[in-house]
Amino acid sequence: MNSRLIVTGTDTGIGKTVFSAALCHALGAAYWKPVQSGLEEETDSEIVARLAQASPQRILPEAWRLNTPASPHLSARLDGVEIRPEEMHIPATSLPLVIEGAGGLLVPLNDKTLFADLFAIWRIPAILCARAALGTINHTLLSLEAMRSRDIPVLGVAFIGEANEDTETTIAHLGRVKRLGRLPLLDDLSPEKLHHSFARNFHIDDFAGVAR
């Protein structure tokens, strides 16, 4: 069975999409963003296609494309629609698949359902992206508790940002979670530099053996 992985995060804007692009390139995976909020600027699917140097066939169409860059429940409301998670089915592909959530783990899809609730239904191993900056211990441990309370399989934590050895070690120990690696912030975010940085800081075997 083909590998499927979820990429989620402790917050919005922490680098999930850049990490997803690097992971897609490393695995030769397809990419799916179930909900895209905000269409005026480059979308996350377009960013991944560019940074992963992925063919159009590897970028699967979003289930929901919403105009306003906001939490999915609000963006949908402003568009006059309601996101129905029960109708959101994982697309079929012959490739490994990276699924990226929107915003943080507990972002609402509608008035009743959080993204984490959808992940709990899918039961696909999830990577939690976390900042390596001050405050991330609290955010990351809370996110891990939320995942485990829903029986979401946790593959590990991917840190993003400048090195903070004590913080990363503390989270791995107290959170009882695998420390997958750390993706540093790149001044020149080119596909080549991103691919090289990912290969230098992560072990592909930590991701390639996952199958559901």
Curated annotation (Swiss-Prot):
<feature type="binding site">
    <location>
        <begin position="13"/>
        <end position="18"/>
    </location>
    <ligand>
        <name>ATP</name>
    </ligand>
</feature>
<feature type="active site">
    <location>
        <position position="33"/>
    </location>
</feature>
<keyword id="KW-0479">Metal-binding</keyword>
<feature type="binding site">
    <location>
        <position position="17"/>
    </location>
    <ligand>
        <name>Mg(2+)</name>
    </ligand>
</feature>
<dbReference type="GO" id="GO:0005829">
    <property type="term" value="C:cytosol"/>
</dbReference>
<dbReference type="GO" id="GO:0005524">
    <property type="term" value="F:ATP binding"/>
</dbReference>
<feature type="binding site">
    <location>
        <position position="37"/>
    </location>
    <ligand>
        <name>substrate</name>
    </ligand>
</feature>
<dbReference type="InterPro" id="IPR004472">
    <property type="entry name" value="DTB_synth_BioD"/>
</dbReference>
<dbReference type="GO" id="GO:0000287">
    <property type="term" value="F:magnesium ion binding"/>
</dbReference>
<dbReference type="InterPro" id="IPR027417">
    <property type="entry name" value="P-loop_NTPase"/>
</dbReference>
<keyword id="KW-0436">Ligase</keyword>
<dbReference type="GO" id="GO:0009102">
    <property type="term" value="P:biotin biosynthetic process"/>
</dbReference>
<feature type="binding site">
    <location>
        <begin position="184"/>
        <end position="186"/>
    </location>
    <ligand>
        <name>ATP</name>
    </ligand>
</feature>
<feature type="binding site">
    <location>
        <position position="100"/>
    </location>
    <ligand>
        <name>Mg(2+)</name>
    </ligand>
</feature>
<protein>
    <recommendedName>
        <fullName>ATP-dependent dethiobiotin synthetase BioD</fullName>
        <ecNumber>6.3.3.3</ecNumber>
    </recommendedName>
</protein>
<keyword id="KW-0547">Nucleotide-binding</keyword>
<comment type="similarity">
    <text>Belongs to the dethiobiotin synthetase family.</text>
</comment>
<feature type="binding site">
    <location>
        <begin position="100"/>
        <end position="103"/>
    </location>
    <ligand>
        <name>ATP</name>
    </ligand>
</feature>
<dbReference type="GO" id="GO:0004141">
    <property type="term" value="F:dethiobiotin synthase activity"/>
</dbReference>
<comment type="subunit">
    <text>Homodimer.</text>
</comment>
<keyword id="KW-0460">Magnesium</keyword>
<keyword id="KW-0963">Cytoplasm</keyword>
<dbReference type="Pfam" id="PF13500">
    <property type="entry name" value="AAA_26"/>
</dbReference>
<keyword id="KW-0067">ATP-binding</keyword>
<comment type="pathway">
    <text>Cofactor biosynthesis; biotin biosynthesis; biotin from 7,8-diaminononanoate: step 1/2.</text>
</comment>
<comment type="function">
    <text>Catalyzes a mechanistically unusual reaction, the ATP-dependent insertion of CO2 between the N7 and N8 nitrogen atoms of 7,8-diaminopelargonic acid (DAPA, also called 7,8-diammoniononanoate) to form a ureido ring.</text>
</comment>
<keyword id="KW-0093">Biotin biosynthesis</keyword>
